[in-house]
């Protein structure tokens, strides 16, 4: 798309391009970055990477805009990812985990193309990992202490109070200005382990 949007579906026969449902898809952009990075790592095709760098940069810029308030997490509208039949929106864990992986891909691409690390991006990756760990897992802390890097302390406190049935058992699916979603998102929980965001005790849950 003109701003870096990646289509979620392409019909080469009918020449139709779809960018998603009513609100478009956030995760198509994330999977595009991850896929490009994995293909490049597997093949060593530098020509492919060099051709795609301008597109990758547009996608990166668009994702930054989708943070809305520049605080590190992507805001996902209703129908904004693959799970468009589920009523979830806001700061969806699945999309944040993909965003973390996509940013790690961007860091590797930058180092290959420019021969040096993008230190600002490295800092963003570290912050995103902390945000995920702090805001999506309700630990059963008896002393009442709160994690660092809370996105919104009032939302977190209310969510923690209502999460007695799932506290310290699984990652929360999402949160938004309306509060937390306590639904068990199997894919997001698996990704949290596969992408090394979960520590060993959380994996064992």
Roles of regions detected by a PLM:
Residues 12-16, 83-85, 172-173:
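Short glycine/proline-rich turn/loop motifs
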Residues 18-19, 49, 85, 118, ...:
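Residues at structural and domain junctions
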Residues 69, 73-87:
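A short, charged helix-loop
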Residues 31, 82-85, 137:
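Tryptophan-centered motif/residue detector
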Residues 1-70, 93-100, 203:
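Aromatic-rich carbohydrate-recognition surfaces in CAZymes
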């Amino acid at each position: 798309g003109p701003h870096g949007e990646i289509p979620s579906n392409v019909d080469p026969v009918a020449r139709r391009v779809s960018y998603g449902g009513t609100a478009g898809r956030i995760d198509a952009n994330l999977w595009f970055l991850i896929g490009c990075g994995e293909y490049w790592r597997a093949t060593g095709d530098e020509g492919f990477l060099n051709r795609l760098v301008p597109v990758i940069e547009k996608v990166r810029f668009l994702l930054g805009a989708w943070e809305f308030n520049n605080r590190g997490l992507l805001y996902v509208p209703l129908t904004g990812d693959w799970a468009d039949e589920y009523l979830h929106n806001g700061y969806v864990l699945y999309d944040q985990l993909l965003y973390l992986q996509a940013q790690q891909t961007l860091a590797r691409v930058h180092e290959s193309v420019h021969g040096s690390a993008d230190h600002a991006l490295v800092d963003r990756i570290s912050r995103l990992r902390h945000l995920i760990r702090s805001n999506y897992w309700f630990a059963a802390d008896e002393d009442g202490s709160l994690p660092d890097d809370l996105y919104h302390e009032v939302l977190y406190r209310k969510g923690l109070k209502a999460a007695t049935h799932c506290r310290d058992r699984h990652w929360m699916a999402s949160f938004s200005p309306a509060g937390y979603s306590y639904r068990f998102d199997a894919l997001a929980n698996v990704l949290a382990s596969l992408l090394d965001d979960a520590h060993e005790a959380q994996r064992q849950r």
